[in-house]
């Protein structure tokens, strides 16, 4: 309530838990311990939703499913299919920021589980490499995601932050600005100004 009373109307959770749940290595690890991923996912969902209870109607809440972002490396891989029916359908947030900058994140099919009215922010621009993405390829991927979510509920962003920790990623300031410029150009071309 302190943040809200100070004027904050948008909070984004950076939730690495869900990213780990997608990882086949993590899934094998917990299975060896006799833990079911579905049970663990449902418990985390319950806890998250409990923490979000009673929020004011004009407070926007979003979740970034983070896969780790330390000095241009990552911590987890795997498509969203193992968590989609739980997280995308039932977490009480307004939007999901999802990493889709490389093959580690799988395809867009799990987006079919996103509850009606929720938005998906497609992280198609990597923050881990200075290489600038091809505009036409990114636009094609947005339209591929549109098979599962209407275009008016899709957005575009970098896959994660440029400096999720003090050391940051292996990009110069100019390379970061060029990526943000690309996001803006693509967004204007796809959704208009």
Region locations from a protein language model:
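Domain-level signal for soluble alpha/beta catalytic cores
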Residues: 1-193
């Amino acid at each position: 309530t302190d943040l809200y009373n100070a004027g904050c109307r948008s909070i984004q959770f950076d939730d690495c838990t869900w990213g780990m749940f997608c990882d086949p290595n993590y899934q094998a690890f917990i299975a060896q311990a006799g833990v079911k991923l579905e049970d663990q996912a449902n418990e985390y969902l319950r806890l998250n939703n409990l923490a979000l209870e009673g929020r004011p109607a004009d407070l926007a809440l979003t979740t970034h499913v983070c896969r780790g972002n330390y000095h241009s490396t990552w911590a987890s891989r795997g498509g969203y299919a193992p968590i989609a029916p739980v997280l995308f359908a039932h977490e009480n947030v307004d939007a999901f920021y999802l990493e889709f900058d490389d093959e580690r994140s799988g395809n867009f099919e799990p987006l079919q589980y996103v509850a009606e009215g929720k938005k998906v922010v497609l992280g198609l621009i990597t923050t881990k490499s200075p290489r600038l993405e091809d505009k036409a390829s990114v636009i094609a991927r947005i339209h591929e995601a549109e098979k599962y979510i209407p275009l008016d509920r899709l957005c575009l962003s970098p896959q994660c932050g440029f400096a999720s920790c003090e050391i940051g990623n292996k990009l110069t300031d100019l390379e970061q600005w060029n990526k943000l410029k690309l996001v803006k150009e693509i967004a204007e071309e796809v959704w208009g100004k």
